[in-house]
From Swiss-Prot:
Naturally occurring in which organism (per UniProt): Phyllomedusa sauvagei (Sauvage's leaf frog)
Gene name per UniProt: PLX-S
Record's signal peptide: 1-22
Protein name per its UniProtKB record: Phylloxin-S1
Record keywords, A-Z: Amidation, Amphibian defense peptide, Antibiotic, Antimicrobial, Cleavage on pair of basic residues, Immunity, Innate immunity, Secreted, Signal
InterPro entries: Frog_antimicrobial_propeptide, FSAP
């Protein structure tokens, strides 16, 4: 009976460690996805500012 209890505790411990590792990996992947999304938004922001600046420059050149 003691052997079964120790075995059960060992299995539960290994399962919890495995679950913890999986959760950590999942959290890291989620953070990477969020970082990539933020970088993409930042790039889009810069591109729109550049396009707006070019448009303003070209309209100024055409008027001048």
């Amino acid at each position: 009976m003691v052997f079964l209890k120790k075995s059960l505790l060992l299995v539960l411990f290994v399962g919890l460690v495995s679950l913890s590792i999986c959760e950590e990996n999942k959290r890291e992947e989620h953070e990477e996805v969020e970082e990539n999304a933020e970088k993409a938004e930042e790039k889009r922001g810069w591109m729109s500012k550049i396009a707006s600046g070019i448009g303003t420059f070209l309209s100024g050149v055409q008027q001048g």
